[in-house]
Amino acid sequence: MTINNILWFRHGLRLHDNPSLLEALKSDCVNQSSEAVKLFPIFIFDGESAGTRIVGYNRMKFLLESLADLDRQFRDLGGQLLVFRGDSVTVLRRLFEELNIKKLCYEQDCEPIWKERDDAVAKLCRTMDVRCVENVSHTLWNPIEVIQTNGDIPPLTYQMFLHTVNIIGDPPRPVGAPNFEYVEFGRVPALLASELKLCQQMPAPDDFGIHYDGNARIAFQKWIGGETRALEALGARLKQEEEAFREGYYLPTQAKPEILGPATSMSAALRFGCLSVRMFYWCVHDLFAKVQSNSQFKYPGGHHITGQLIWREYFYTMSVQNPHYGEMERNPICLNIPWYKPEDDSLTRWKEGRTGFPMIDAAMRQLLAEGWLHHILRNITATFLTRGGLWLSWEEGLQHFLKYLLDADWSVCAGNWMWVSSSAFERLLDSSKCTCPIALARRLDPKGDYVKRYLPELANYPAQFVHEPWKASREQQIEYGCVIGEKYPAPMVDLAIVSKRNAHTMASLREKLVDGGSTPPHCRPSDIEEIRQFFWLADDAATEA
C-alpha cells in the first residue's frame, strides 16, 4: 500500500534541516516497512506566498532560481517540484480530492500576514480528513513560545527577549538528512495539471508581468538563489567568521563593513530558507567554541556572536501577534509621528537616487540594480528619508524596500524601519544618534570608489569633492565632466537646517507624549551600546550634520 503525502514549500526552500520534509517521508503507520510513501513536493504561486504580493524583478528572479534549484535536486532523485499557479486552498482541495492525500506538511510561517491563509488550509485539512503537520524551522525559537514564556506578552526590550530565550534554552540543532531510498515521487494527471495550471517548466519573472526596472543600471554583484549556492556561500562566510574570532572580534560584516563587496551576507538565503537559520547559528557557535578551545585568549561567547540572527528572532516575535506591525496608526508599539505627506517629488527622488547626496543616491541605485544593500547603507538611506532629512514616513520606505530588497522580510524590514525612524525599538523620539550621510560616507568610502561605481557621472571627481560635489567650483565641475544641477542634482535639502528642525520636532513630540501620559508600550534598546552597534557609530563625527 502507498501513502500519498504533500510537502508544501512556502519559505524553507531547501532539503537540509527540513523537519517538514522528514515528516512528509513518514507513512505514519505502525509498521512503516509495509507502507511506501509517495511524495508530492509542491509550490503554489498564489500572489502572496514567499512575499510575492510586493515584489520586484531581482527578488522574483532569486525566488525562481531557488525553486529551480529545488527542482533539479528532486529530478536527480527521480521526481520534480510541482509548481502551480492559483489560490492555495483551491489547489490543495483539488489535490486532496484527486490524489487521495493523507498528510500535508509545511514549515511554519509565523508572521500574521500568513494567518488567514494557513487557518483556511488547516480548516480544509480537518474537513477532508487530511493530517496537517506544521514545523518550526524558519526561526530559531517558536515566537509563540517566546511570548508565552514571557507571561503571554511580547518582550519589550532586546535584553528581555534574551532573558526569555535563555529560559527556553538553546535553539534546536539541525535535523538529519532525508532518506529517499524507499520514496516514490507522485505525478499529477494531465487533466488535473491543466486545471490547476501546473507549470511545465520553471517560469521567469516576465511570466508574472514583472519586468526589470533597474533603469539600465549595471548590476556589479550577481546574486543567485538556491540551496546549492547558499551552502557554498556558507563555507566562505564561515572562513570570514573564523578569521574574526581568531583576531578577537565577532559579527565581521558589521564590525568591518565592506560596501564594495563581494558581499558575504547570508540574508537573502535565510529569507527564502535556502539556508537553515539553525544551521547558520550552530555553525558559527560551534566554530567559536573550536577557536576558543585552541586560543590562549578567552572571549565571552553567547548570543551576541550571532547578534544579527537574534535581532531577526526578536522582530519576528514582536510581529507575530500584531497584524498592523507594518504600519503606523494602528500599530500598538509604534509612535504616531506626524510625518510630512509626500506632496512633491521628494519621495520619487529618494527612490530613484536623485537626492543630490552621492552616498544616498549610490545606495538607492544599487538597490534598484542589484536588490541588495549593506546594513549600514540601509540605515543611512532610511535615516535620510525619515528623521534625518526629508521627514517622510517610514511606511513609504518600507514598501519600497519590500519590493526591491532580495532579503525583504516583512517582520525584519518593518522592525528596522521603525527603529531607524525612532518610531519603535529606539529611545523615545531621540534624534541624538542621527547618521549624517556625508560624515559617514567619508568614513565608509574615503576614496569614493563606491560612489563612483554606482554614480558614473561623478567618476572624475577627486576624493576631496566626491561626497560633496557641490563644493567644487563651477570651473572644477566642468573639468570633472559633471556640472552640479545639470548632470547630477544639487542637494535637495540643507542638512544642517533640516537636522536641527527635525531634532526640535522630535523633542517637542517627546515632551507632549511624556507630559500627556500617552506613551505607548514603546519597544526600546537596552543600552547605548545596542544603538552604536546598530548604526555603526564609532565616533561622534558620524552623527554630525
From Swiss-Prot:
GO biological process, any: negative regulation of DNA-templated transcription
Full protein name: Cryptochrome-1
Cofactor note: Binds 1 FAD per subunit.
InterPro entries with a match to the protein in the record: Crypto/Photolyase_FAD-like_sf (IPR036134), Crypto/Photolyase_N_sf (IPR036155), Cryptochr/Photolyase_FAD-bd (IPR005101), Cryptochrome/DNA_photolyase_1 (IPR002081), DNA_photolyase_1_CS_C (IPR018394), DNA_photolyase_N (IPR006050), Rossmann-like_a/b/a_fold (IPR014729)
GO molecular function: blue light photoreceptor activity; DNA binding; FAD binding; flavin adenine dinucleotide binding
Binding sites annotated in the UniProt record for FAD: 237, 265, 267, 308, 375, 407-409, 413, 416
Organism from which the protein derives: Anopheles gambiae (African malaria mosquito)
Domain description: FAD-binding region regulates cry stability, cry-tim interaction, and circadian photosensitivity.
Gene: Cry1
